[in-house]
Regions:
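Multi-pass membrane catalytic core of lipid/isoprenoid biosynthesis enzymes
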Residues: 70, 75-120, 166-177, 213-220, ...
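C-terminal membrane-associated helical module and adjoining short loops/tails
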Residues: 1-15, 132, 150-301
Length: 301
C-alpha cells in the first residue's frame, strides 16, 4: 500500500532530497574573497550568486546520483531512507526536477560571467563522469572528489575576478583529498560494523580500512605543510601585516585533522566530514580560532 507521504512528498522531503544541508560545501566559493581580502559589495554579491548557482546544480547532481544508485541505496543501512530509495519521491519526479534545477543554476551563473558558466559546466561534466564511472574506481574517486571541491574555489576566484593562487590550489587539493578519504573511511567502517560485504558500487575492500585512514591523515598533513611554506612566501607579506601570527594556524589545523580521523576511527563521525564539521562544537570553535588568527595577522601593527 502506498502511503500519503509517498503520494504527496512535502517540502521537508524535497529539501532532504536536494541535500540542502550539503550547500555548506558551496561556500568554498567565498574562499578567494577571504584570501584576496576583496571584501567589497560587488565581490560578496557575486560570490553569493555563484554559491546559489553551484547549490542548484549540485542538487541536480545529487538527484542524478540517487537515481543511478537507487537499487544499491536500498540495500544500505542509512541510504535506504533517502527519499528516492525509500519511495517517498517517485523517480519520475526526480527526473523532471533535474533539468529544472540545472536551468535555474545556469541562469544564476549567467549573471556572474560567461567564464563562470564555463567553470560550472566543467564542474557538471566532471561530476557526471564521477557518477557514471569514476566513483567506482579505487582512489580515482577520491582524487576526483578533491578536484570537485577545488573547482568551487577556482569558480569563486573567477566570479570576483581575482588571480588564482597556486598556494591556495595546492592547499585545497590536499585538504579536500584528506576529507574525501575520511568519507570513504567512514563508509567502510559503517559496513564493517553492520557485517555487510564489500561495497558493490565502490572498488574498495573492507580490508582497505587501515590504509585509507593512513592516506587521509598523510594528505591532511601535506596540506598543513603547504600552508607553512605559504607563510614564508612573498605573497604573504603583501596581504598580512603580521604574517608570523599565521604560524599558529598550523598546530590548530594539525589538531583538527588528527581529531577528525580519530573520531572517524571511533565511529563518531557521519559519512561526510564537512557536514560533521558544521555540527561539531569543537570543529566550530577550531574554525573560529583560525578565523581570529587570520584577522589578527591582517591587523596593522
Amino acid at each position: 500500500m502506498v502511503t500519503a507521504v509517498r503520494q504527496n512528498p512535502g517540502i521537508i522531503t524535497w529539501l532532504k532530497q536536494l541535500r540542502v544541508h550539503q550547500y555548506v560545501k558551496n561556500s568554498l566559493v567565498f574562499l578567494p574573497v577571504v584570501t584576496s581580502h576583496q571584501f567589497t559589495y560587488r565581490a560578496i554579491s557575486f560570490a553569493l550568486i555563484a554559491c546559489a548557482a553551484f547549490s542548484l546544480c549540485a542538487s541536480a547532481v545529487y538527484m542524478v546520483n540517487d537515481l543511478l544508485d537507487i537499487e544499491a541505496d536500498r540495500q544500505h543501512p542509512k541510504k535506504k531512507y533517502r527519499p528516492l530509495a525509500s519511495g517517498a519521491i517517485k523517480p519520475l519526479h526526480g527526473k523532471i526536477a533535474v533539468p529544472v534545477l540545472l536551468a535555474l543554476g545556469f541562469a544564476s551563473a549567467a549573471v556572474v560571467s560567461s567564464e563562470f558558466c564555463l567553470v560550472l559546466l566543467a564542474y557538471l561534466a566532471l561530476t557526471t563522469a564521477y557518477s557514471i564511472s569514476f566513483k567506482r574506481k579505487m582512489l580515482v574517486d577520491v582524487v576526483v572528489l578533491a578536484m570537485l571541491y577545488t573547482i568551487r574555489v577556482i569558480a569563486g576566484a573567477i566570479a570576483i575576478s581575482v588571480p588564482l593562487s597556486a598556494w591556495l590550489l595546492a592547499f585545497s587539493m590536499f585538504m579536500f583529498l584528506s576529507l574525501a578519504l575520511m568519507k570513504r573511511y567512514s563508509e567502510l567502517a559503517l559496513r564493517i560494523d553492520h557485517n555487510l560485504p564489500d561495497p558493490s558500487n565502490r572498488n574498495y575492500k573492507l580490508d582497505d580500512l587501515a590504509i585509507v585512514g593512513c592516506l587521509a591523515v598523510s594528505s591532511g598533513f601535506n596540506a598543513v605543510t603547504i600552508f607553512a611554506l605559504y607563510i614564508n612566501s612573498s605573497a604573504v607579506e603583501q596581504l598580512y601585516a603580521r604574517p608570523e601570527v599565521l604560524w599558529l594556524v598550523c598546530p590548530v589545523l594539525t589538531y583538527w585533522i588528527g581529531r577528525a580521523m580519530i573520531l572517524a576511527h571511533r565511529r563518531m563521525m557521519n559519512e561526510d566530514p564537512i557536514v560533521f564539521a558544521i555540527k561539531d562544537r569543537v570543529s566550530l570553535i577550531t574554525g573560529a580560532l583560525i578565523a581570529a588568527l587570520v584577522l589578527l595577522a591582517m591587523s596593522k601593527k
